[in-house]
UniProtKB/Swiss-Prot annotation:
Family designation: Belongs to the ABC transporter superfamily. ABCC family. Conjugate transporter (TC 3.A.1.208) subfamily.
Superkingdom: Eukaryota
Gene Ontology CC: membrane
Organism: Diaporthe leptostromiformis (Lupinosis disease fungus)
GO molecular function: ABC-type transporter activity; ATP binding; ATP hydrolysis activity
Protein name according to UniProt: ABC-type transporter phomO'
Length: 1561
């Protein structure tokens, strides 16, 4: 190639051999030197790629070897939880790579090979066709290194494809390869341009290089479409199979956006996420966040131990966001240079066109670089915090399974899982801002000083003051957050009690008092958070101080240091302001983050303290480790000993000086059936806890040994909200259907299961079932697991006698399955029928001593030995359950999804909660703040325009600066008042109203609905949703409003300063509208799924904690944890995808800003070049104002997006509250209109509110009652009594009549399952009636019907002649006294309620009378031990057993109703198996207590014991929802049917009447 002789050395080829970087203009205009391009564009990226590729290859090969070893070790094991995993668990399956990916890989390898060939050809042409004088010293080495780098590409791509982690998905193109190819294309293009200029565009070398560039683009495209080939054949994450560009611009999310836009997303329809986020992988990486040997005390490093452990668990991935963050910092800090160059270009007159084109190109590179680096930075940061979330939640669940059950632990776990983990993850997402902010500050200050000199250092002073303030606030914020979260825990604990006891609360009519107690706790919570919220106000005020005060201090110092007449050029002033704004804008965020870090450290400290808690020690393991035999050392072993306890004393607390069980010695051989009995509160359940290892012996030299697999059934059955069939086989690995059939038949569940819908759930803790059905399910589940040792804690007490006798014979009889399998059984019971079949009977007395015992013989024993109990009326018709449930595959959420709740309704609900005046003040405060914040920019524009010509200035600099300083102080005053109003007034006001809305919805919901909803789902609304309302929503609302109003002001300023930009505003508005329209549909659904999936975690944690003893007894922890991990995977997917779509939106908005910047720059350059002739030109001050706002507009829009998307999430919580409140069926206050009632017997009194004294006498009358749990149409047929009335009315004139009239009707109702069918019954005032029947016969339903808790479709129920259908339900339940089956004491733990106030809130009785009641009920000693009547009523303080709780509730009822009844008043008392947990002697005494304290009260009692039933005036037996028998025990002639029902004969009554021996006595 020929060239002209150079005129100087700078214009010869020697100029190309210098580093430059710019080449002399006489050679080429606006270009780099060849040497610079070879070093920077070829050598550096190629060498870096080769080093990184070698490191990656070593990592892949080492990982492949580790996986091969791990696979060999794990293929022999079976995942016991696979049947319970769902949703995104599918991504765990190792789907083989299909033909599409194989063909794609071949194409990629062929393209890469051809590319290497072209590079080798180019190297040959460079050496052969280009003279050495036209090459630099690095031309050939650079080409060799480049060829080597491209030779590594197919090698690395091949190993990424073949040696991938099996669960990680197909990666046909490595991210590293994609990054290198994209960088190589961008950098290689200028080099090809240089070669074309040097060697001619038609040379062979240039042609090969152009072909190489094209082939690189093809290879990039091949890599980008790898995800399309993968999606067709696999179920792997589209993110992992996406290429570099797909990851950079978020194209892998397009499938999610399209699906969300067109259809409704569900947890199962979400795309699989990155396999590195799978819980099993995260748990392995984060396993050391749990202390190896927890000491029960905080760790040595305190809050930093867990923080360091988290980052250590992330490993090098913790540093992944560093590179994109540095790139983002570089692009951001380049903006002032661009602005300064643009202002100089505009202000310095004509300039070459290439300078303008260079500015446009620089604008494109800078703002596009900001967009892409922002996307990468936040995607990598969110991936890390998603891992941290998974690790922390998984760690909390693991730790919970290792702890002993203690009061408050469950609420603490739920609070940590939601509140603390959220605070930690949302804060740690900004972790890298902590180290990059000082770097940006240092560079920005240095550059500021270059413009204004030493006065620029003043900005460091204000930054230091603000940082010190934020650090101080952060330290105290952690303390105040602890105080606040402690109050949250108390409220959550009380709410959990309320939800768990919702049936008892509704029956007792305690809803209003419970709601008031929860509201009181809510108020205490806001009082506890007041200082925390005040600190937030201080934080926000401090964060805005730098942005507003720094310009004033810098310019003031500059003016004072120079002369009073000093003036600024537009370039100096606006460049300085841009640097200050770039310093202040991230500092606003940083100064808000620092206190948040303090709060996050406080949360880490709370979780770490939880991790350090002393763990449950399984004494069985320790004993078995010492000696595999449970026999005494030195003792000749004749029989195999299953369990033994030697010289051991036990108590519920380790520090108790007086053990409950003392010097226990017990040896039980394999196959023995041992019964333990004793009075209430003597320690029977504690003995079982000791055998389980849940409590440790308190004396030295003790020994507890258990040999074999254990199963445990507690007195309160632990059941999960599954179908009944799933419960039975829940933890069974035995797939033998014949064994399952035997267990189902032995537990008398066959007919019950056949009557159930296969998909119907049983409700939280089996709330849709009767007590007997719950216990039988738990018993079947335990036996199904084939235990060696079975521990039963009074599980048969809620079961009717006949069913119980069958179960006893089929389980414990000589042909029973437990006898056949040689299962050792230890059973706590008060039931003599159970004791009959025991090999050993032991009794615990009040002193804690365990002694052999023999029940006295009774006539019942003789009958049971001589006759079969399976005769009589119980076989005359099939048994039916009164608790059949509708098909329910999960908890019944509101019928409409939250997405159906419009935004208008959500905002209206929130604005209604804060009040109209507060709303107006908030909007006004925001507008004032935005105006005050941005108006100084306009003032600066006027200032520079006026000062451009000092001779014509209208005002001196003091005028301009003084007003400028005042204007910059106004935003601080405005923001202080604005935020104070929000945090101190709006937050408690809205939080209280929304909490009350939830409480009212739950308390007023129909019983049939609320009993089917998962407790975890409900609790999630009181926990997570209200946490969003209290802590997230106010800050999100403030940040959204501030960013929105500020952004509007910036756009206005840009448009006013650069008028030509106004033409792009409509286009910008249209783009933003379409963007939000497309984005919001998906993001809203993901937010809902995020909240929904956390409800599942709530449920799993809550259910697991309630069943800890049962789970640990059978060692089901691993399976429970695996299932929790499956639920955590389902929860991680929407969380991660929501963060990713938010990152995508940030990327797109930054690209929009890039487009706006290009419009500004292009118009400015165009007007400068061509506008002089037409008179249209851009002013320097106008461009300065435009760029001053443009440099921060992108960050403003990003902040707006971040705050707005977070606000949408919190508003999603309000949408859930609105949806739940709207779609939850509420009880009607009055079932029918009073004027439509049939007043038979009631006269006209039904039309008015019952008098205060109602019911005065307590008479009850049921006439042809048909009742159902179906509440879809409560009022249906309530006003139509035809067909439901008895044939003849029972007179109400006081004459003696048969108390019960049994009628039949011809009407048949087959469309609805009726729990009560044509019940007619009359109970006279003061009469005591026992209601008996088989399990599920409708006994409890009868009481629920009386209380209006189930729908009475036909018939009539009246009390004292008044139809209860016309009585408000709250009034009805308040007038009837109830003791439910599951005793409920109080939710008010922690708010100061005393035992005295709980027993007699109205103060009707004196302390002596209250003490007498407690003494008669047998719980006075417990109350005295807890601190007397002035002690707290909390469960932790009382420590009552199940039986003692029933006695306490009885005492409370007597205290509240006894005054009236003892002075001649009547009333009604309903007992729903209220003494089922008491021994027979105590049960008998309760009847005497009731007669003593409530002599005139009408009693309707559901019970199972014949001995107790015979103490009542009459006995009613129900079967299949109908009245089967009614007898009066005192009659001389009684039908034998009633005794046949109880498995007794007539002789039993005769022995009772003649003083025969009875074990009751």
């Amino acid at each position: 190639m020929a060239s002209s002789a150079p005129s100087s050395s700078s214009c010869t080829f020697q100029a190309e051999s210098s580093f430059g970087p710019a080449v002399a203009s006489c050679r080429r205009a606006f270009d780099f030197t060849l040497y610079f391009e070879e070093v920077v564009f070829v050598l550096v990226p190629s060498c870096v790629f080769i080093l990184l590729a070698a490191t990656r290859l070593l990592f892949i090969l080492r990982r492949a070897r580790r996986f091969t070893t791990a696979t060999a070790a794990t293929t022999t094991s079976t995942d016991t939880s696979s049947s319970h995993s769902c949703g995104n668990a599918a991504q765990n399956q190792h789907t083989p790579i299909g033909h599409g990916l194989a063909h794609h890989h071949i194409l990629q390898q062929c393209t890469a090979g051809l590319l290497v060939t072209l590079h080798v050809a180019g190297l040959i042409l460079l050496c052969t066709t280009v003279p050495s004088r036209q090459r630099t010293d690095l031309s050939v080495p650079a080409s060799v290194v480049a060829a080597l780098a491209f030779g590594v590409v197919p090698v690395l791509a091949h190993f990424e494809h073949k040696r991938r982690r099996p669960s990680s998905g197909p990666r046909s193109s490595s991210l590293l390869v994609g990054l290198f190819l994209c960088v190589a294309v961008l950098l290689r293009a200028p080099l090809v341009r240089t070669h074309a200029a040097l060697y001619g565009s038609g040379s062979a070398l240039v042609a090969v290089e152009i072909a190489s560039l094209v082939l690189q683009l093809v290879l990039i495209a091949v890599g980008e479409v790898s995800s399309w080939a993968a999606d067709a054949t696999s179920n792997f994450s589209p993110e992992e199979s996406a290429g570099f560009l797909g990851r950079s611009f978020g194209s892998w999310l397009w499938g999610t956006f399209v699906t969300g836009y067109r259809t409704t997303l569900s947890l199962d329809s979400l795309v699989p996420i990155d396999s590195s986020l799978e819980s099993r992988i995260v748990a392995t990486s984060f396993d050391h966040i749990l202390p190896v040997s927890p000491s029960g005390k905080p760790g040595k490093n305190g809050q930093y131990r867990l923080l360091l452990a988290l980052f250590r668990s992330l490993g090098l991935y913790a540093l992944a966001p560093v590179i994109p963050r540095l790139c983002l910092a570089g692009f951001t800090l380049a903006q002032p240079f661009l602005a300064s160059a643009t202002i100089n270009y505009i202000g310095n007159g004509p300039a070459p066109d290439r300078d303008g084109y260079g500015l446009i190109g620089a604008t494109f590179l800078i703002y596009t670089g900001i967009a892409v680096s922002t996307g990468w930075y936040w995607s990598l940061s969110y991936k890390n915090v998603t891992k941290i979330r998974g690790g922390l939640v998984d760690g909390v669940s693991q730790k919970m399974l290792r702890l002993s059950q203690q009061h408050g632990t469950e609420s603490k776990v739920l609070t940590m899982m939601i509140n603390d983990v959220y605070r930690i993850t949302s804060t740690l997402a900004y972790a890298h801002e902590l180290w990059v902010a000082p770097i940006e500050t240092a560079i920005g200050t240095w550059m500021l000083c270059r413009h204004v000199g030493p006065p620029g250092l003043v900005v460091l002073g204000i930054i230091g003051v603000c940082l010190g303030t934020s650090t101080y606030v952060g330290k105290h914020m952690a303390i105040q957050q602890g105080v606040w979260l402690a109050a949250v825990e108390r409220r959550i604990g009380a709410t959990k009690k309320m939800l768990a006891s919702i049936k008892a609360i509704k029956m007792m009519g305690a809803g209003p008092s419970v709601a008031e107690a929860l509201e009181r706790l809510r108020r205490l919570e806001f009082a506890a958070s007041r200082k925390f919220r005040a600190l937030i106000v201080g934080t926000l005020l401090s964060s805005y101080s730098t942005a507003t005060l720094a310009p004033v201090l810098v310019f003031g110092t500059y003016i004072g240091a120079t002369t009073a007449a000093a003036d600024f050029s537009a370039s100096t002033l606006f460049t300085s302001l841009i640097w200050i704004s770039l310093l202040a804008s991230p500092l606003i965020q940083l100064l808000q983050i620092i206190p948040s870090f303090g709060a996050a450290l406080g949360s880490l400290e709370r979780i770490d303290a939880f991790f350090e808690k002393q763990e449950f020690t399984d004494e069985r393991d320790e004993a078995t480790a010492v000696d595999s035999s449970c026999s005494e050392k030195g003792e000749k072993k004749k029989e195999h000993v299953s369990l033994s306890i030697h010289n051991s004393s036990f108590s519920y607390t380790d520090d108790s000086e007086d053990p409950i069980l003392k010097d226990v010695n017990l040896v039980i051989n394999r196959g023995q059936h041992v019964v333990v009995t004793g009075p209430a509160g003597c320690g029977k359940s504690l003995l079982l806890q000791a055998i389980l290892g849940e409590v440790a012996p308190q004396n030295s030299g003790s020994r507890v040994c258990v040999d074999g697999k254990v199963a445990f059934c507690s007195q309160t059955p632990w059941l999960e909200n599954l179908s009944a069939r799933q419960v039975v086989s829940r933890f069974s690995r035995d797939k033998d259907p014949s064994w399952t059939d035997r267990v189902v038949d032995a537990c008398e569940l066959r007919e019950f299961l056949e009557a159930q819908d296969p998909d119907a759930t049983i409700g939280s803790q089996g709330s849709m079932l009767s007590g007997g059905e719950r216990q039988r399910l738990a018993l079947a589940r335990a036996i199904q697991s084939r235990p060696d040792i079975l521990l039963l804690d009074d599980v048969l007490s809620p079961i009717d006698y006949v069913t119980k006798k069958r179960i006893l014979r089929q389980l414990f009889g000589k042909s029973g399955i437990l006898h056949e399998t040689g299962t050792t059984v230890v059973q706590v019971t008060q039931d003599h029928a159970v004791a009959q079949l025991a090999d050993i009977v032991l009794r615990l007395d009040e002193t804690g001593a365990l002694r052999p015992y023999q029940f006295p013989p009774s006539q019942a024993d003789v009958e049971d030995e001589n006759g079969d109990v399976d005769n009589g009326a119980e076989n005359t018709r099939p048994r039916e359950s009164s608790h059949t449930t509708e098909a329910q595959s999960g908890p019944p959420e509101p019928k409409s999804k939250p997405t159906e709740i419009t935004d208008r309704k959500v905002y209206a609900t929130y604005f209604e909660s804060i009040g109209f005046l507060n709303l107006v003040l908030f909007i006004g405060g925001g507008i004032i703040f935005a105006f005050c914040l941005k108006f100084p920019n306009v003032w600066v524009g006027w200032w520079t325009a006026d000062s451009s010509d000092p001779d014509e200035a209208s005002h001196n600099i003091g005028y301009w600066f003084g007003i400028y300083a005042m204007l910059n102080v106004l935003p601080l005053i405005a923001v202080a008042g604005w935020v104070a109003q929000l945090m101190m007034l709006i937050v408690p006001l809205s939080g209280s109203k929304l909490h009350r809305k939830l409480v009212d919805t739950v308390s007023k919901a129909t019983f049939s609905f609320i009993s089917r909803v998962d407790t975890g789902s409900l609790l999630n609304r009181f926990n997570q949703d209200l946490m969003f309302v209290d802590s997230r929503l106010p800050l999100d609302l403030f940040n959204t409003a501030a960013a929105l109003l500020t952004g509007i002001a910036q756009v206005i300023l840009i448009g006013v300063s650069a008028v030509y930009v106004l033409a792009s505003i409509p286009v910008l508005a249209a783009v933003l509208f379409l963007l939000q329209h497309f984005y919001l549909r998906t993001s809203k659904q993901l937010r809902h799924l995020d909240l929904q999936s956390k409800a599942e975690l709530h449920t799993r944690l809550s259910e697991s904690y309630q069943g800890l003893a049962t789970i640990r007894a059978a060692r089901w922890q691993r399976q429970v944890h695996a299932e929790f991990q499956a639920g955590l995977d389902r929860s991680q997917a929407p969380v991660y995808l929501l963060w990713m779509v938010q990152t995508w939106l940030k990327l797109v908005l930054n690209l929009v800003v890039a487009g706006l910047a290009l419009v500004v720059m292009g118009a400015a350059v165009g007007l400068h070049q061509h506008g002089s002739s037409s008179g249209a030109s851009a002013s320097a001050s106008g461009i300065g104002i435009a760029f001053l706002n443009l440099t921060t507009l992108g960050e403003t829009m990003t902040n707006l997006l971040t705050a707005w998307t977070s606000l949408e999430t919190t508003l999603g919580a309000i949408a859930r509250i609105v949806s739940f409140s709207r779609d939850t069926p509420a009880e009607r206050d009055v079932l029918v209109r009073p004027d439509s009632l049939d007043h038979g017997g009631g006269g006209g009194g039904d039309r008015a509110e019952p008098p205060e004294s109602w019911p005065e006498s307590g008479g009850i009358k049921l006439e042809g009652v048909w009742a159902t749990y179906d509440d879809d149409d409560e009022s249906d047929e309530n006003t139509d009594d035809s067909g439901g009335r008895p044939a003849t009315d029972v007179a109400a004139d006081g004459e003696k009549h048969e108390a019960t009239t049994i009628t039949t009707t011809s009407s048949t109702m087959t469309t609805t399952h009726y729990a009560l069918k044509d019940i007619s019954l009359e109970v006279r005032p003061g009469e005591r009636v026992a209601v008996c029947g088989r399990t599920g016969s409708g006994k409890s339903t009868l009481l629920l019907a009386l209380l209006g808790l189930v729908a009475v479709r036909r018939g009539r129920i009246s009390i004292d002649g008044r139809d209860v259908a016309g009585v408000p339900r709250a009034r009805l339940r308040g007038a009837v006294h109830v003791i439910p089956q599951d005793p409920f004491i109080s939710v008010a733990s922690g708010n100061g309620e005393t035992i005295r106030e709980a027993l007699d809130p109205a103060g009707k009785l004196g302390d002596e009378e209250v003490t007498d009641v407690l003494q008669d009920c047998g719980v006075l000693d417990k109350i005295v031990g807890a601190g007397g009547l002035a002690a707290s009523v909390s469960d932790e303080a009382l420590s009552l057993s199940a039986g003692e709780r029933q006695l306490f509730v009885l005492a409370r009822l007597i205290c509240r109703a006894g005054g009236r009844c003892r002075h001649g008043g009547g009333g009604i008392l309903l007992l729903d198996e209220a003494t089922s947990s008491l021994d027979v002697n105590t049960d008998g005494k309760t009847a005497e207590v009731l007669r003593k304290w409530l002599p005139n009260m009408t009693v309707l009692s559901v019970l199972h014991r014949l001995e107790a039933a015979l103490k009542y005036d009459r006995v009613v037996v129900l079967e299949g929802g109908r009245v089967a028998h009614v007898v009066t025990p005192s009659e001389s002639t009684v039908s034998s049917d009633i005794f046949a029902f109880f498995g007794r004969s007539r002789s039993f009554l005769e022995s009772r009447e003649t003083g025969g021996v009875s074990w009751l006595e």
